[in-house]
Amino acid sequence: MRRPPLPPLPPPLRQGDRVRLVAASSALESAERLEAGIAILRSWGLDVGEPGPLVGRWWGYLAGTDSERTEDLTRQEPDGSMAPLLACVRGGWGSARLLDAGWTGLPSLASSQWLLGFSDVTSLLWSRWARGCSGGVHGPLLTTLASEPLWSQERLHNLLFGRGLAPLE
């Protein structure tokens, strides 16, 4: 039995590429751990904006209303482009609600974007895969990236920038 071909990965990131911060799940109370993750992405040469309204944005236990969180995922940059990396700031609860709340605009754009996260973000990663889009990385959230061991950070960097990955030992 032949397996269907895997969808191609998004283009590798390059220094200067834009990163959009996404709060698709639970609310983020403080920026301290988020800032540490942002600093790592900036050290890789990526253009990461300020977290702005993502910190302290609450709607019950969620990081905003369903429409606000969907907007985090689908918003275009001021020049009309899409950021090549959507980096989720935290997991928790609530991202699966977005699958019923109008996440339909993303699949046509998602094949050229990476989506990084785990925990509750897994529902978004699986939804991308089910729609034939790769580039979903079940990896650190921005609030956990700085606490990852260096080898893990380096593997993520190599994956996103299209460099080879050595086998895990």
Predicted regions and their residues:
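ATP/NTP phosphate-donor binding region
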Residues: 1-82
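Short, well-ordered alpha-helical microsegments
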Residues: 30, 94-96, 124-125
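Cofactor- and metal-binding active-site motifs of prokaryotic enzymes
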Residues: 64-72, 121-122, 129-131, 137
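N-terminal glycine-rich "phosphate-gripper" loop used for MgATP/nucleotide binding
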Residues: 87-101, 118
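Short acidic, glycine/serine/threonine-rich loops at helix termini
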Residues: 98-100, 127-130, 148-151
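Short, acidic/small-residue loops that bind anionic groups at enzyme active sites
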Residues: 104-127, 135-142
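Conserved anion/nucleotide-ligand pocket segment
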Residues: 134-169
